[in-house]
Each structure stands twice: as structure tokens, then as C-alpha cells.
Amino acid sequence: MPKRVQIVLNEDILSLGMDGDLVEVAPGYARNFLLPFGKAVPLTPAVMKQVEHRRAKEAERQAALKQEAVDFKTALSTIGRFTVKKQTGEDNVLFGTVTNGDVAEAIETATKKEIDRRDIVVPEIHRTGKYTVTVKLHSEVTAEINLEVVGY
């Protein structure tokens, strides 16, 4: 009996791997838990071909997402500057601060494309003026945008 068997996971298993991963486990773990509950399948040439096909599809999808992020970065740079209006007091000091939600709203208004506010890094802004904000569009693509904060 082999000390380890190779299997392909059908779902994410916290201590083992993600869906589609090729892993080596103890034969008893595979035979008594993973295989009977449909959480994995034994590695065969046909299954290996399916895994390679799935990986190629995923790589293609990731490349398309990256290209979309690069295109959006270009669109952001052509717009140039985004404006956020906030209530101000004396000496152009803001009541409150400019949040990443405010910046996301300004971007959505200008581009008509929704962006997650958690992907926006805003420096501490307590006065009116011009600032640089970082937007993470993809794991490999970030954009620097110019933000103008004006008072009313």
C-alpha cells in the first residue's frame, strides 16, 4: 500500500487546498473521508486532462480580468481629475474627512462603472486641495488618480 495517494479536490478544504488542486494525502484519509463524500477524485489520466483544461480556462479568465483592469486604468488616466465636494469651515478645513466611499462615488459618477470602496487607498484628508489616491483595480494593476477636494 502506498504511503501517499494523489487526488484532485472537488471543493475547497481548509487544511488541504482549493477546488481543482492536485494534492497528496494518506490513503486512509482519501478512502474513508474524501472519496466517499465526493470531496475529491483519484488522479487518473482523464482527470489530469480535466484539471489542465480547468487551469487553462482559469488562466484565460484571469488574463481577461487583468486586461479589463488595464483598460479601466487607461480610462481613469484620460479623465484626469475627480472632484469631491465637502462642507468646509474656517481656513478650508473640512467637517469630517474624505472617505474611500466618497472617492468611489466620484469615480462611479464619472465613469459609470462600479468600483469597490475597499480597493481605494485615501490619505488623511482634512482640508480642501489636490491629493493623489491609489486605486487597486487588479492584484497586478493599480492606478494613481488625482482627487480635488472642494468646499461648499
Swiss-Prot record:
<dbReference type="GO" id="GO:1990904">
    <property type="term" value="C:ribonucleoprotein complex"/>
</dbReference>
<keyword id="KW-0689">Ribosomal protein</keyword>
<dbReference type="Pfam" id="PF01281">
    <property type="entry name" value="Ribosomal_L9_N"/>
</dbReference>
<keyword id="KW-0687">Ribonucleoprotein</keyword>
<dbReference type="InterPro" id="IPR020069">
    <property type="entry name" value="Ribosomal_bL9_C"/>
</dbReference>
<keyword id="KW-0699">rRNA-binding</keyword>
<dbReference type="InterPro" id="IPR000244">
    <property type="entry name" value="Ribosomal_bL9"/>
</dbReference>
<dbReference type="InterPro" id="IPR009027">
    <property type="entry name" value="Ribosomal_bL9/RNase_H1_N"/>
</dbReference>
<protein>
    <recommendedName>
        <fullName>Large ribosomal subunit protein bL9</fullName>
    </recommendedName>
</protein>
<dbReference type="GO" id="GO:0019843">
    <property type="term" value="F:rRNA binding"/>
</dbReference>
<dbReference type="InterPro" id="IPR036935">
    <property type="entry name" value="Ribosomal_bL9_N_sf"/>
</dbReference>
<dbReference type="GO" id="GO:0005840">
    <property type="term" value="C:ribosome"/>
</dbReference>
<keyword id="KW-0694">RNA-binding</keyword>
<dbReference type="InterPro" id="IPR036791">
    <property type="entry name" value="Ribosomal_bL9_C_sf"/>
</dbReference>
<dbReference type="GO" id="GO:0006412">
    <property type="term" value="P:translation"/>
</dbReference>
<comment type="similarity">
    <text>Belongs to the bacterial ribosomal protein bL9 family.</text>
</comment>
<comment type="function">
    <text>Binds to the 23S rRNA.</text>
</comment>
<dbReference type="Pfam" id="PF03948">
    <property type="entry name" value="Ribosomal_L9_C"/>
</dbReference>
<dbReference type="InterPro" id="IPR020594">
    <property type="entry name" value="Ribosomal_bL9_bac/chp"/>
</dbReference>
<dbReference type="InterPro" id="IPR020070">
    <property type="entry name" value="Ribosomal_bL9_N"/>
</dbReference>
<dbReference type="GO" id="GO:0003735">
    <property type="term" value="F:structural constituent of ribosome"/>
</dbReference>
